[in-house]
């Protein structure tokens, strides 16, 4: 009899992965240092994270198809390598804005898109009895990425500069995501947690029709969900690009201390 891994260990690894990936929400703390150091406009700097988020949608789509064939671990390992590498290569941007776009925006965005879908998709399979709870935990981990990263990045920028901070964080992200990826695996077919018996409604949900891509895109619901996600993401990016400077300029802010370069 095959011994199954502890599902809570997989959940912890998933949260670690999401926290590292969610660090993209801390982008705004780089905005002022980059504009001051290289004379770039706010719009030019913000475009880097805009590219990353745009690429996320495409990469997540491809990653979902790949994960169906190869499993979550390979996808997560690739995500960690690309995400960490993209952020690390941003440290070589200097005055070359195009390199920032290609590294942080394109390469990092692909890694982020591949990685984001892995924990949520994997954990709901291990926690059919607590689908809502485990999804909330995973998504919360992503949201906490900025809460954890922003003050750390702010202090690093003040001490070693924005580019060196990219290098440090890139290595940390690579180790965190690829390390967590080693724990990602699907449960066996028909898996039920010990002592759990699905209700009639849950059994009906688990046996619901699975749509192919062609079938899904033939429904209005698919386009409605896409539009909803697009609007949600657009609003989020608008806030992300301004959150750090707003917090740094607000009196009494405790989340983001006022760094030396803002004085």
Question: What are these language model-derived features?
Answer:
Residues 25, 53-61, 146-147:
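Residue-level signature of mid-helix packing/kink "hotspots" within the transmembrane helices
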Residues 142-189:
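Helix-loop-helix hairpin linking two adjacent transmembrane segments in secondary transporters
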Residues 59-72:
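Helix-to-loop junctions at the C-terminal end of transmembrane segments
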């Amino acid at each position: 009899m095959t011994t199954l891994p502890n599902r809570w260990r997989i959940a912890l690894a998933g949260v670690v992965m999401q926290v590292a990936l969610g660090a993209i929400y801390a982008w705004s703390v780089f905005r002022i240092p980059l504009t001051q150091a290289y004379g770039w406009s706010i719009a030019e700097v913000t475009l880097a994270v805009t590219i990353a988020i745009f690429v996320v949608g495409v990469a997540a789509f491809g990653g979902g198809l790949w994960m169906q064939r190869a499993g979550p671990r390979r996808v997560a390992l690739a995500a960690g390598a690309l995400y960490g590498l993209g952020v690390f290569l941003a440290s070589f941007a200097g005055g070359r804005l195009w390199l920032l776009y290609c590294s942080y925006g394109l390469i990092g965005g692909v890694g982020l898109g591949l990685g984001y879908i892995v924990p949520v998709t994997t954990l709901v399979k291990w926690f059919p009895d607590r689908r809502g709870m485990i999804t909330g935990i995973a998504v919360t981990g992503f949201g906490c990425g900025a809460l954890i990263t922003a003050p750390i990045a702010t202090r690093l920028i003040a001490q070693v500069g924005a580019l060196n901070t990219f290098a440090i964080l890139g290595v940390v992200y690579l180790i965190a995501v690829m390390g967590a990826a080693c724990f990602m695996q699907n449960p066996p077919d028909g898996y039920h947690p010990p002592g759990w018996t699905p209700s009639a409604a849950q059994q009906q949900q688990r046996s619901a029709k699975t749509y192919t891509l062609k079938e899904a895109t033939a429904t209005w619901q698919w386009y409605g969900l896409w539009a909803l996600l697009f609007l949600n993401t657009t609003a989020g990016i608008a806030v992300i690009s301004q959150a750090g400077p707003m917090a740094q300029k607000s009196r009494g802010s405790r989340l983001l201390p006022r760094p030396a370069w803002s004085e």
